[in-house]
Amino acid sequence: MAIQTEKPIECVGCNTFDMKSLFDNRDCSQVIEYIYDSEGQAQEALAFFTQKARDVESEPCEIQSEITKVDDGYLLKADFTFCCQAELVIFQMRIA
């Protein structure tokens, strides 16, 4: 049975929070390490991740990457450093 009332429900403080408590900008980097079957696949993956970073950035994202031949294939190691933690979180959601 639902409660019926003509008076609107007021909730002071509901759905509000201090953004500084969520994003303190201590963590602005994402390291990605994957092994691909071919160097071409690793390069395509790097291009994909780079484009996702470029789509998110408000200031240039610093990207350091290398592709190395390993026993199982080709290891892509990439470090994406954003200007703020909020951009990092958006990037993480877009690549998930």
Swiss-Prot record:
Cellular component terms per the entry's GO annotation: cytosol
Signal peptide: none
Family: Belongs to the UPF0381 family.
Protein known as: UPF0381 protein HI_0636
Species of origin: Haemophilus influenzae (strain ATCC 51907 / DSM 11121 / KW20 / Rd)
Phylogenetic classification of the source organism: Bacteria, Pseudomonadati, Pseudomonadota, Gammaproteobacteria, Pasteurellales
